[in-house]
Structures are given as structure tokens and as C-alpha cells.
């Protein structure tokens, strides 16, 4: 089950029984008994993490994990999440009421359930903005979105991308040589965009070789992996707007690795605190939504015509639509993660019981399910890079919203002076300096939460 295919089914299937069946299969991964049930293993991992933290002199694993992060303490991370959580719940309640009204309007005699949310949200979006995913997708060809990501990097950082024919690990993977403005080799970039059975779900960036100067001028080899639906032979790959955003997000990570300019490999590229590492990726998403980018690259796959301005305007008007749901879905995961790894004693832990009680304590809306439930929460338990650190996406979003506002304040989304500071202090700097100092060097001050609340449509919402 891949998220992109399951969510598309939940959006468009009119069969409520099949939506429920698909949704239950999706959210119950890892807790169905047998050899694929992860709950006992996860409980053991959480307990061992707590033991390790105590051996190192910390009260909990969360205290240990955040000690060298930008947030520094679990309390600081929770303060941000709590500020967003109340507003998100209030906004989601209004969204739920609108969807329930639509159910009643169509003669439905049932209470909105989690497997209904995306279906009726798509209907409401179409009614409210005269917009549906099927109308948008023909304008988002994978090839054009790759071009858009590359051209944005060219305008901001002077990079160009030259296709390279070389042996790779799978026929779907492609490679490009990355050159700077003077034509010098910067990196090798590999894109592997289509879903297949040998991949786990999601999208990610990884480095096959990091940039460093300790043993010579070593240039990086960087890989982006996605799970977009592969088209039939001879047909173009078409993306949802969310898929296109994912492509830009992962390419932001790739640029963080490719533009690295440090001496020591341990400080190279994305080797930064996890609550800072999402800044380059989430910030890069903003350039997809610059009207100039969409006008140039959002073109119909058959006619080649650009997206009509009226459709483009309606698309951009939806940016805060359903943000209550999106924010609740994410923030619940971040809060549960922090709470789980803040347990002073995790021995004898029942993962399902803990998740249920923690969500009840938080007053989680019944119509929304965590984006990643604990039994299949790969960020936390497949390597553990985000254990007690899933809050970092929201923390980084405070940074990215504030950082893009710096470009907007110049009146030019590609302002050269601002782009140079961004490259010097963020994309190329690795972990050379404390993230707070790096951000202040770029922005001239520390970030505020105001731009984030505005971006998510929460600025004028009163906490529930």
C-alpha cells in the first residue's frame, strides 16, 4: 500500500464500504498479529531508548534527543506544538461541520468518519473553488516538475543539470551532472521517482557520497526517491499538486547535500540537527507556488498550453483549505512522539493503549487519524532518526515560512542577494555553526511564528 494510491482512492471512490476497507488496511499496518505485528518490538525499542538516556545522565529519551537540537528541550518543542494544536483543532472542527453538512445535503444518514473525510473534502473543494484533482493533474507532468525544480535552483543558485547516461541500480532511476554557474562539477544527482514493490512508502533523500575536503575535493552523489504512480507505457506521469510539492521538498533536501561546502564529512550537507534539517526542503516548496513557476511549467500534457489563469488562481486560493485537518493529522503525531519518548519508565508498555489514551487526553477529533500511527511510524522506528524529533517538521516550518517572507519582503521571490545569503548560511554551511546563529546570519533575526500561522490559515483562529 502506497500513500499516493491509497489517498487518491479515498478522495475519489464513491463506494463508502470500499473506502472504509482501504482505510482500515492502511491505518492498521503493523498491528494485525503474526510476524508483521510491530507493537512488541516498538515497546522494546522505546524502553531501551529510555535506558540509554538514563545511562547518559538524562531523565528521558526526549531530553537526551533534544539536548543538541535547535529546540534544546522537550518543553520548548511542546510549547510550539501546543500553540498550533488548539488553533488547528478549532479550524478542523469548522471543516468537519462543513463536511457533515455536505453529507446531509446528499442524503447521507451517517456521521462523518475518517474514511469519509478526503472524499467529501474533494467534493467541497470542487464546489467551493470549482476545482478537482482530475482537472489539476493534466497540468502537472512529472517531467515538467523536474524541470521546474531544476530551473528554480538555476535562478537561485546558478546551477544547471546535464543528463548523464550511466549504469544505475534500476531502469527507472535517472542521473544528472550538476554544474555551477562557471560550468564546474558540483554533484551527481539521481532521481528514482516511481513506486515499486521493493520500495517502502514515502519519499526521501539520501546521500551515496557526502561532500568533504578532508581527503581531497570530494563531491557528493545525492539520490531522491519517491513513490509516484508509474504511468502506462507511452503515457506521461501525471502528479497531484501534493505530489509536485513532495518533489520540490525532496529536491530541497538534495540541494542541501549537493551545495555543501565544508571540510569535515561529519558536518557535511544534511548532517544538521533534525529540527533544522527540514528548513531547506520545506522552504524549497514555496517556489513551486510562485505564480511565475506555475505559469511556466504547469502545462497541459496534451496541448502544451499553460494552466489558465483562472484555474491557477483557484488552485492557489486553496492553500489554506483543509489546513485544520492537515495540521491536526501532523501535530497529533508530533505530540504523541514527544509524549512517548518522555516516559520516565517505559517497561511493560502497551503501544496501542498508550496511543489511544494519549490521543484522548489531547482531545483528538474522532474524524481524524494520526498521519502515522505508532505501529507503522517509520520516522520513529525504522532507524529512529526522528525519534522524539517528529516535531521538527513544524519547528522547521516556522523557519521556512519566516525565511520565505524574507524573499517576499524584497518584492522578488528570486532576489539574488537574499539567495546568496541563503546559500552561504543554510544550503552550503552544513553543521558549521549553531542553527540559531546560522538562521540569524541569513535573516538578521530569529524567526517568529506569525508567518507559519498565516501560511496555514490559523492566524485569526481562536484555540479550541
Identify what each model region corresponds to.
Residues 1-64, 148, 184, 359, ...:
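Noncatalytic, helix-rich "gating/capping" subdomain that lines the substrate-entry/channel surface
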Residues 1, 43, 48, 52-227, ...:
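Active-site-proximal, well-structured secondary-structure segments within enzyme catalytic domains
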Residues 26, 227-230:
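Short, histidine-centered active-site or binding-site loop motifs used for metal coordination
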Residues 127-129, 144, 148-162, 167-170, ...:
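C-terminal, non-catalytic "cap/extension" segments appended to globular domains
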Residues 222, 241, 256:
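Acidic/His-rich structured neighborhood in mature extracellular/periplasmic domains
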Residues 34-37, 80, 243, 388:
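Non-transmembrane, amphipathic alpha-helical segments
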Residues 229-248:
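Short pre-active-site segment immediately N-terminal to the catalytic Zn-binding motif
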Residues 8-9, 73-74, 231-236, 265:
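Short small-residue beta-strand/loop micro-motif enriched in glycine and branched aliphatics
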